[in-house]
Amino acid sequence: RQGTEVSLASPGTWPLTPELTAECLLEAQPIFERQAAIWQNVLEDRADNRELEELDGFINNTSIRLRLICKETAVELPGDMYANCWEKHEIPPCTLVKLPHHGHRDSITPHLLDMLAPKTVVISVSNTRTDDCPAASVLQMVREKGCALYVTDAIPDSNGHVSNHPAIHFDI
């Protein structure tokens, strides 16, 4: 909408209700400065393919990582960050994590899954995707850790058959 005010997100913790807190976590400033410089070059028609490929390689890591905490329950919402980006941080365990990037092979690593130690993992993905999302290796890793696994669309089995699946619904 024209005239809508845009403001930059900044890291911090905000009480949303007496029992619900939101933590906003971002990567270090240099990644955002580089992103801004590339976008400025695009707007001024000075960007080259090399810069656009560079941006494509890191833009998902500019996602806001949001953690919602209500009493003993923590929900980790990492946007589209690649696992190798956010696993560099000390992250406390959570109750539920929504995997980034539709469960792509780069969305989680064994180290990150160990650190998060979630009881439940959610993957937002459509079964009409033609890429490897969710990745079979990710599904296997999550199942081997004993996490409850929910997807937002059915995943075809090895024979291509799509059956009913557990779904998840959030009420806040």
Predicted regions and their residues:
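Flexible, acidic/histidine-containing loops and adjacent segments that form or flank the divalent-metal
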Residues: 1-76, 147-172
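C-terminal functional module detector
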Residues: 25-26, 106, 115-119, 123-161, ...
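Active-site-proximal loop/helix segments of hydrolase catalytic cores
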Residues: 37-134
